[in-house]
Amino acid sequence: SEEDLIASRDHRIFLGFPMGAVTTWYRMMDSMRYFRYYVPFSGSLYWGNRTTVAQYGWDNPNWTAQLLEDAIVAQGYTADDFYVLTLTGTKDFSYRTVKMQIDDMKQHPDMFHYDSDEVKGNFTLLLAANEEHDYHAKRLYIFNALPILSQMIEKREQQ
């Protein structure tokens, strides 16, 4: 039921690669009642709604974090209500736009608490050295993300 889905959001993850990563960001903007954890692999909001991107500019990194923050607040959630684990490769063609978005999110510390220690903040970027935009990288990201997410869920249950 709808109530059960909402009540169990702390055990639900939305994950995607690469256009699935764009979908992941958009689900964070409209479906937080169903998911606490968001794991975009090699994709950013820059690849999303062309109207929004055209409005703000392709190389303007100053709109994605505000767009996310406004959507989170509009849903009635705060910085304590989500965790984002972003992964990409240093040779992935998406690296540039992912990094631009993460850098913009770091400029909004009231909502996005960046920490390279993936169990302290509410969002983390992990980079895979020399990984490209391919199946091998995706498998590597899943392999590394699942234990981190498991730790996050366990930590949450102990509170």
What are these regions (language model features)?
Residues 1-159:
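Non-catalytic cap/lid and distal C-terminal segments of serine-dependent acyl enzymes
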